[in-house]
Amino acid sequence: MSVAIGYVPGAFGQGGRDPNFLRQLVQVGDTYGYDSLWLSDRIVGRQWSLEPIVALSMVAAYSDRLKFGTSVLALPLRNPVVLAKQIATLDYLSRGRCLPAVGLGQEDPTEYEACGVSKVDRGQRTDEAIVLMRRLWQEDRVTHEGAFFTCHDVSITPKPCFQPSPPIWIGGRTIAAAKRVGRVGDGWLVSSVTPDEVRRGRDIVFATAAQHQRVIEDDHIGVLLGYYISPDGQKAVAKAASFVTRPRPDVPFTACSAVGTTAHIAERIQQYVDAGATKFVVRPLCPGEEAMAQLAMMGQEIVPLFHTPTVSTMDKARRP
């Protein structure tokens, strides 16, 4: 299976005063052969961030090669009919390059309150929304009467270019999230996990899919991986630690990120590959003004190691 590496600017690299930064971000991806560009989702908050669906329409226009996706979209806060229309439009105009990844949203109840949605029901809302969106993409006339959403004899156009429908990736590192992927998802995009946790979660995904008579592609296991490249490993760890958005109390952040020299980062990515992951979304653990340089280094020194399947990635990483 081939490995694909995409990138997300992260909470500290989504621009600011210069709207042209998004064009520059796309140019980095095209210049260095990244597979895809992803944007995170925050509806309210003081931290500067773009609305991802709107911003990704610009990405689709700036590049005719890059795939693009949400990493990840807080699905319970969206109307699934409107979102299905938005994603179908993006996918149609980009000729099948849209990769929707969704999740339950943040633990902070502020966004749920602001959007008029109960946090208590977010898991059930997500499951129902995924089923409804997929029907709207695949069927001409849809009637749905569920616990949270209702529509009668509706259709959306255009239909997505990606047939039968864009794959819906689901985030979350819990057992419940892995089981949700198996029940209703098409892929797992997980963050803040160790390679061993990827291996165990992957087993849960495929076991749950089998229980529900579903098939998930072997290469639809992905990792959102924080990283920082530096020849000085100790300084890299000290710097990157300040930019870990949601540190885990039970695991040091270095166990579920890639921080240090090029060889170390390549080895860490290979550990995830060995655990069954083939898709990666890398995020620089650094200030926004340094993010572009880090993405360029990753694109120059790491991406070619994994996007060229004919040569061992470890052999190439160890070359002087």
Kindly label every feature range from the protein language model:
Residues 8-12, 42, 73-75, 103-107, ...:
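Active-site beta-loop-alpha junctions enriched in small/polar residues
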Residues 30-31, 56-65, 87-97, 182-183, ...:
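Acidic (Asp/Glu)-rich catalytic clusters
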Residues 7-19, 73-80, 162-173, 252-263:
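Active-site mouth loops of central-metabolism enzymes
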Residues 1-62, 164-166, 285-288, 313-319:
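N-terminal beta1-alpha1-beta2 module of alpha/beta enzyme domains
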Residues 17-29, 86, 170-180, 261-271:
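Short, acidic/polar
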